[in-house]
Amino acid sequence: MAGIQQQQLVNDTLPASWNGSSNRIASVNVEEGQPQPWVDDLDLEDPNHQKPGWRKFLSYVGPGFLVSLAYLDPGNLETDLQAGANHRYELLWVILIGLIFALIIQSLAANLGVSTGKTFKHHTSWILGKHLSELCKAEYPKYVKYCLWLLAEIAVIAADIPEGIISSLLYYFKLILDTYLLIGTAFALNILFHIPVWVGVLCTGCSTLLLLGLQKYGVRKLELLIAVLVFVMAACFFGEMSYVKPSATDVLKGMFIPKLSGQGATGDAIALLGALIMPHNLFLHSALVLSRKMPNSVRGINDACRYFLIESGFALFIAFLINLAVISVSGTVCSAQNLSSENADRCGDLTLNSASFLLQNVLGKSSSKIYAIALLASGQSSTITGTYAGQYIMQGFLELKMRKWIRNLVTRCIAIAPSLVVSIIGGSSGAGRLIIIASVLQMILSFELPFALIPLLKFSSSTTKMGPHKNSIYIIVISWILGLGIIGVNIYYLSTGFVGWLIDNNLPKVGNVFIGIIVFPLMAIYILAVIYLTFRKDSVVTFLGPNKNDPQQQANMENGLGPEMERVPYREDLADIPLPE
């Protein structure tokens, strides 16, 4: 009976363009209760009605800064350092294009969370918003859903093979990042206070849990802390750039003249792109916006999407400037005419820890301390957002019912384990080798990107998911061109890189044939999986419009003429991470 009533609710709310019927599946999280009062029952000239402005905009500020930290984590900074050391400023254009692309994609993720799971007037129930991982779980059949999960596990295992560490226990996109986030902070503590790296790893895990405890007193306080850490990083790296004084002309050329010269430039460019556009960030952003209470009207949703776009744009602009500063510092120092042979060797194998000594030798001890403070801010803030992303992904795909503070504690302990073991056994050099391996994972993340990006592009362009808030034709064209472009680059580099390795390695022919028999079918499956996700039709409805029998409501929704409504119930499970009393 409940299923019949739910289907009747769907039939009564289908847009007129569906001709009164649909064979699609409706996925709704219905919360019964008294509907909230509607503003259209009140005086529209009510002076207490909140109009668009700075105060309203500031109520939406926060998610963009949390998301921007994925572009400023220690692994990203190390990739920047290596790109600058190897290619000077030539790859700055990759950072610029990547962050423009990231802004477009992140805005789609925010819009998806804001716009899905909505309901309009004359419904006696409420439908809460859904984020990307929940939509994927509702949309795809079980075998596809578990294949997506297994792809992430393969990436984790790939990190496990070279060093034999236990990072294969870490779950999904976010947790494969924790290794270098923890090590980055531990390096910073080692530089600042000369404590062993393994002690720094333990301090990092404890401090992350304490910082997450701030959210017990309100999500805004934690978001404010994250924003402060971002600006601390910006101040530190711009301070570094003031030491080296890079050529403004060369920097501008690197930003606006695409160039891939020198050995390994293509691989470094893909690593940079993989470091900038991370799959877990798409899941994170679509969930973070649901922590805000927002109107449930076309006009209110449009305002929210616009505010989130502006906020994300500002946060990503700061992230771009920080990445630019890191590459400029590394490129200038390592290409200096008077560079000693010892420092030249460091430039050839630059890591987060060796970079501090390089800066100290070339620019002085104060420069090394500034770098360490920036690295500390990067590591701490990134571990926080990584924990968020892991919780949202696990909640969406697996519907884990574990209490959040317990899940938070367990995931932090698991994340600390590989870093702690390696840092105890190998010290700073062992931890350095671990973070080099973690940097290789940036390319694996780039290969995994289609399996988060394609669902996002499809859902955000779908009337069944977004209603009148779906992407415009211009955004659809631009986003799909960008998405297919990076997917094509990934497939090309994967194919040519593997073929080149087969030709140049010293394995016997039988071994090469055996490897080819295994790998080429996997590459074909990868391409077929991308094609499947691209062309599969969506079947689950999450946007319920106004009653089809009310032409006025239809016109109000489609034209954005409906008045503002009272704030609707929001995702309290996403708005806080309660810790034990």
UniProtKB/Swiss-Prot annotation:
Its membrane topology: Multi-pass membrane protein
Cellular compartment(s): Membrane
Keywords: Glycoprotein, Ion transport, Membrane, Transmembrane, Transmembrane helix, Transport
Coiled-coil stretches: none
Biased composition (Basic and acidic residues): 564-574
One GO location term (cellular component): plasma membrane
Gene Ontology MF terms: cadmium ion transmembrane transporter activity; manganese ion transmembrane transporter activity
Record field: transmembrane: 57-77, 90-110, 146-166, 181-201, 224-244, 270-290, 307-327, 370-390, 409-429, 434-454, 473-493, 513-533
Region of interest called Disordered, as start-end residue ranges on this chain: 551-581
Keyword set includes Transport: yes
Pfam families linked to this entry: Nramp
Glycosylation sites noted in the Swiss-Prot or TrEMBL record: 11, 19, 338
InterPro entries from the UniProt entry: NRAMP_fam
Superkingdom classification of source: Eukaryota
Entries under HAMAP family matching the protein: NRAMP
Family: Belongs to the NRAMP (TC 2.A.55) family.
Function: Probable divalent metal transporter.
Protein name (database record): Metal transporter Nramp7.1
Natural source organism: Populus trichocarpa (Western balsam poplar)
